[in-house]
């Protein structure tokens, strides 16, 4: 069983992540984790914060000489801006002199619509929304991406590869034929796009739209898609509701800040089709079972089919709008404009990378549930043995 936790505040000393349940023998490097964290910073429309904040990563437990030990893995991401925030975000009771003049020490009493500010203040009885936003911030996803980097390293040992791309920003969307999805070999080209869009023409239109929305003092949301190749048939279960892989994946994507909807495969579009067109018909190809299409997104009945996994997340526009929205000053009970914190115009490209990590962690859980072992060698043996045990007349094509 794989469990993982994160801790830390947006402007705190560091983010901390713990991964428990990984087998021994997974190759892990700081370079790989650092590369994944740098991908999270990609995308036109990110805030100035991405330019001067650095993700300084430390593996403090569970990895020795580039390989996991089977014990909990501990990852620390130090805040490079901690010096500016140390007096304000100290866990100790601060001196009055440290808090008197600093602009950062001022309370935030104007909760931002669309954020967790007001509900967090109500839930915990806080009078200052900083006590909410520091943890609710999407900065926490850096720790998720670090965990996801380790999960990806594990999955790649089983020839399972995960990527993402942006399908839509605002009203601008990519239009491609069924089956013409990006492959893992396309990841470098996707990452080189300023909006991480697979199609060059659509990418330029998205960039133009972001320029326009920035001039208007507004923000945009959109849709990203995560794909996983190399998944064997049989991950997940139809036996219990909480073991259905599509349910677990949906929860994982929905947990990403600002995601408001999740679709697997063709998602909502399937509801408009007749049954004769909506389902993936099964045929024989070179002696193996395969499907003529992938409307289902690689999951049927909560179980993987062997086709590519496709899951999309729809992200609402960034809630911190430069053209401040109406709110109420909690300290005076008077109408006010919402506090404006430094933020992105659009974070869909970054959310896509976070989505990769959430999918990688969820699939890793399913892999360990089915093929669990104490070492990577043992899991590889179990994985191979399972594939070899499937009766020949039932074996499906595994899409890679």
UniProtKB/Swiss-Prot annotation:
Protein keywords: Amino-acid biosynthesis, Aromatic amino acid biosynthesis, FAD, Flavoprotein, FMN, Lyase, NADP
Matching SUPFAM superfamilies: Chorismate synthase, AroC
Domain of life where this protein originates: Bacteria
Known cofactor(s): FMNH2
Binding site for FMN: 135-137, 257-258, 301, 316-320, 342
GO biological process: amino acid biosynthetic process; aromatic amino acid family biosynthetic process; chorismate biosynthetic process
Classification via InterPro entries: Chorismate_synth, Chorismate_synth_AroC_sf, Chorismate_synthase_CS
E.C. code: 4.2.3.5
GO molecular function, one term: FMN binding
Record text on cofactor binding: Reduced FMN (FMNH(2)).
Cellular component terms (Gene Ontology): cytosol
Top-level enzyme category: lyase
Reaction catalyzed: 5-O-(1-carboxyvinyl)-3-phosphoshikimate = chorismate + phosphate
Positions of NADP(+) binding: 40, 46
Pathway: Metabolic intermediate biosynthesis; chorismate biosynthesis; chorismate from D-erythrose 4-phosphate and phosphoenolpyruvate: step 7/7
Family: Belongs to the chorismate synthase family.
Subunit structure: Homotetramer.
Functional note: This reaction introduces a second double bond into the aromatic ring system.
HAMAP family assigned to the protein according to its UniProt record, in alphabetical order: Chorismate_synth (MF_00300)
Protein name (Swiss-Prot/TrEMBL): Chorismate synthase
Species in which this protein is naturally found: Tropheryma whipplei (strain Twist)
């Amino acid at each position: 069983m794989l469990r993982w936790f994160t801790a830390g505040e947006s402007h705190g000393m560091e983010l901390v992540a713990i991964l428990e349940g990984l087998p021994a023998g997974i190759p892990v490097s700081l370079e790989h984790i650092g590369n994944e964290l740098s991908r999270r910073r990609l995308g036109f429309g990110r805030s100035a914060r991405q330019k001067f904040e650095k993700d300084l990563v430390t593996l403090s437990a569970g990895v020795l000489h580039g390989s996991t030990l089977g014990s909990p893995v501990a990852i620390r991401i130090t805040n490079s801006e901690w010096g500016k925030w140390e007096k304000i975000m100290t866990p100790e009771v601060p001196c009055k002199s440290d808090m008197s003049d600093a602009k950062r020490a001022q309370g935030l009493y104007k909760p931002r619509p669309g954020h967790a500010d007001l509900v967090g203040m109500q839930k915990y009885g806080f009078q200052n929304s900083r006590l909410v936003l520091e943890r609710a911030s999407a900065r926490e996803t850096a720790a998720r991406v670090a965990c996801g980097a380790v999960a990806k390293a594990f999955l790649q040992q089983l020839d399972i590869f995960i990527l993402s791309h942006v399908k839509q920003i605002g009203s601008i969307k990519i239009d491609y034929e069924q089956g013409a999805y990006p492959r893992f070999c396309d990841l470098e080209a996707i990452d080189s796009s300023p909006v991480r869009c697979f199609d060059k023409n659509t990418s330029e239109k998205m960039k133009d739209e972001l320029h326009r929305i920035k001039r208007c003092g507004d923000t945009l949301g959109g849709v990203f898609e995560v794909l996983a190749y190399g998944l064997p048939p049989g991950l997940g279960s139809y036996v219990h509701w909480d073991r259905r892989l599509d349910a677990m994946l949906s929860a994982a994507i929905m947990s990403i800040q600002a995601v408001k909807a999740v679709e697997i495969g063709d998602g909502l579009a399937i509801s408009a089709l007749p049954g004769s067109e909506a389902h993936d018909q099964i045929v024989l190809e070179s002696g193996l079972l395969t499907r003529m299409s992938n409307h289902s997104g690689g999951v049927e009945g909560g179980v993987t089919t062997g086709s590519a996994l496709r899951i999309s997340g729809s992200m609402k526009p960034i809630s911190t709008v430069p053209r401040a929205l109406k709110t109420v000053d909690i300290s005076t009970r008077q109408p006010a404009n919402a506090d404006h914190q430094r933020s992105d115009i659009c974070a869909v490209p970054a959310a896509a990378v976070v989505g990769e990590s959430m999918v990688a962690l969820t699939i890793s859980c399913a892999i360990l549930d089915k093929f669990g072992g104490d070492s990577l060698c043992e899991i590889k043996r179990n994985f191979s043995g399972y594939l070899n045990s499937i009766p020949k007349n039932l074996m499906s094509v595994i899409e890679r």
